[in-house]
Regions:
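Acidic, Mg2+-coordinating phosphoryl-transfer loop and its flanking beta/alpha structural elements
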Residues: 105-112, 243-285
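Short, acidic/turn-prone active-site loops that include or flank metal/cofactor-
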Residues: 53-59, 109, 217-220, 269-274
Length: 317
């Protein structure tokens, strides 16, 4: 499976700017991710932007603040229409042609280097693939394993995560985060089994449909922490399923799940796809030094080891 983030999209458009016709004076975003791509491209190229329905209806497009004159926007002479994938490109070309609008059709990610109806493909990216801007709409959700906290809702704060009254309040009032538009195959959470009723109630209130809810069957939060069961439980549930993807909020757990299951994990903290191959190429980052450790390192650099040692002896008295 291939994954592309919004950062990947922006980088590709930046690197491909020289491939866009120089005479472009209007960028049109085709429905879906094409609108996002067009927004980025019009800012990079410093030209106005419109959407497909607006230009077909003859509505004027907005002029960017960087335009030198303040008069009305002139009729576009060279239109570039952008889609994130090939879906709908042929239809868009036909509709633009029927309206007498000549346009260069750009597909950001095509199945191959050539796409019917497109003049330019920026990157060949075969299926299966998933994008940051549409992962909660992707058909893979119907078979995927998905975390709850940090994905469907915000993580509890330290104060809320007390395994008591504050946590019960969190479970019923958690703020929604990413909203799926499809039924999720399996929800896999390290929430304790004793909180199933509250979890199911919140999911129902949010209108989130799913096939199965897997929860950690341990007596307490303290026992869960003692066993370090978060990642291993999720990994084993994922490994035993036929799910092709796990969506996890936290990088450390995503790496653990990918390592133990041998299957890909979409990490929302880094917006990257974690696999055994990526783990082999990029070992885990070194722990971030503590504030005290950082201060000591700065002091040694500024004062030198001898003066730092002298100060330590002085204040130890």
């Amino acid at each position: 499976m291939h994954y592309r983030s919004i950062t990947d999209l922006a980088d590709l458009l930046q690197q491909s700017l020289h491939r866009i016709p120089r005479e472009t004076d209007l960028v049109v975003g085709l429905p879906g991710g094409g609108v996002l791509a067009a927004n980025i491209l019009c800012l990079l190229a410093n030209v106005p932007m419109s959407d497909l329905e607006s230009i077909l209806a003859g509505r004027s497009f907005s002029v960017g603040r960087t335009k030198l004159d303040g008069g009305p926007a002139p009729a576009a002479q060279h239109v570039v229409a952008v889609a994130d994938t090939a879906e709908g490109v042929a239809e868009a070309r036909a509709r633009l042609a029927a309206a007498g609008i000549a346009a260069t059709l750009v597909v950001v990610y095509g199945d191959g280097p050539d796409v019917p109806g497109a003049d330019l493909v920026l990157e060949a990216l075969p299926e299966p693939r998933i994008f940051q801007w549409s992962f909660m709409q992707h058909p893979v959700l119907e078979r995927a394993c998905v975390d709850i906290d940090g994905v469907l809702c915000l993580d509890p704060t330290h104060a809320e995560n007390d395994d008591g009254a504050a946590y019960l309040e969190f479970l019923t009032t958690a703020r929604p985060l990413y909203r799926p538009v499809r039924r999720i195959g399996t929800l896999v959470t390290s929430r304790l089994e004793k909180y199933r009723a509250e979890t199911e109630g919140w999911l129902a209130a949010q209108g989130i449909a799913y096939g199965r809810l897997a929860m950690l069957d341990l007596p307490s939060q303290a026992e869960r922490i003692r066993l370090g069961a978060h990642g291993s439980f999720k990994a084993e549930t994922y490994r035993q399923s036929d799910a092709p993807l796990f969506i996890e909020s936290e990088n450390r757990q995503a790496r653990r799940i990918a390592e133990l299951s041998g299957k890909p994990v979409l990490c929302l903290e880094t917006h990257s796809l974690v696999t055994r191959e990526t783990l082999a190429r990029a070992p885990a980052a070194a722990p971030v030094p503590s504030t005290l450790g950082t201060a000591k390192a700065i002091a040694r650099g500024l004062l030198g080891p001898a003066r730092v040692a002298a100060l330590k002896r002085r204040f130890a008295r």
